[in-house]
Design a protein with these regions (language model features):
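Short, small-residue-biased leader/transition segments that mark boundaries at the very start
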Residues: 3-8
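Short loop/turn motifs at secondary-structure junctions and domain boundaries
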Residues: 14-20
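Conserved beta-hairpin
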Residues: 22-36
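Conserved acyl-donor/pantetheine-binding loop and adjacent beta-alpha core of acyl/acetyltransferases
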Residues: 35-70, 76, 86, 126-132
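Conserved G/P- and acidic residue-centered "switch" motifs that form tight phosphate/ATP-binding loops
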Residues: 79
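Conserved GNAT acetyl-CoA-binding A-motif
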Residues: 85, 91-105
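C-terminal "cap" of GNAT-fold acetyltransferases
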Residues: 105-106, 121-139
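Conserved acetyl-CoA-binding loop of GNAT-fold acetyltransferases
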Residues: 113-123
Length: 139
């Protein structure tokens, strides 16, 4: 049977095809141990449909989004996720983007705040029945 992991893998492959320039991996011990990715838009917050409809990605959009940040369990708590966020922020700045935006669950807010992002409040997202928060940083 197909698990949530299979659905997620298909989404990641779609994203890699739609915006390969916005897909960054972390490599350690000669293996991929994490990644960060996201499309670009002109919207200041991230609507749910952006996750599911890759055609909403605008390569020339002024705002960089984060769709996914993941580090495999055995490499977590080693600073890899933070390095990916910082690298992605710098990449967005270098490309002339005006901001970086994302949605996250409550327990991740302190992590993103430690990387300069501001919490805007509860997001409109209802993905997975969870409560999500809009986060952003303007450059």
């Amino acid at each position: 049977s197909r698990g949530l992991g299979d659905v997620y893998k298909r989404q990641v492959v779609k994203r890699m095809g739609a915006f390969p320039e916005n897909f960054v991996v972390a490599v350690k011990d000669e293996q991929i141990v994490g990644f960060i990715n996201g499309g670009t838009t002109d919207k200041p917050v991230l609507p749910d449909e952006f996750y599911h409809d890759i055609t909403l990605h605008r390569k020339d959009g002024e705002i960089q989004t984060v769709f996914g940040l993941n580090v495999i369990p055995e490499y977590r708590h080693q600073g890899i996720a933070g390095e990916l966020v910082e690298y992605f922020k710098e990449l967005a700045k270098e490309r002339g983007k005006k901001a970086l935006i994302l949605t996250c669950k409550e327990h991740m807010i302190p992590f993103y705040e430690s990387h300069g992002m501001k919490k805007l409040g509860v997001a409109d997202s209802c993905h997975g029945g969870a409560t999500w928060y809009d986060m952003q940083i303007w450059f």
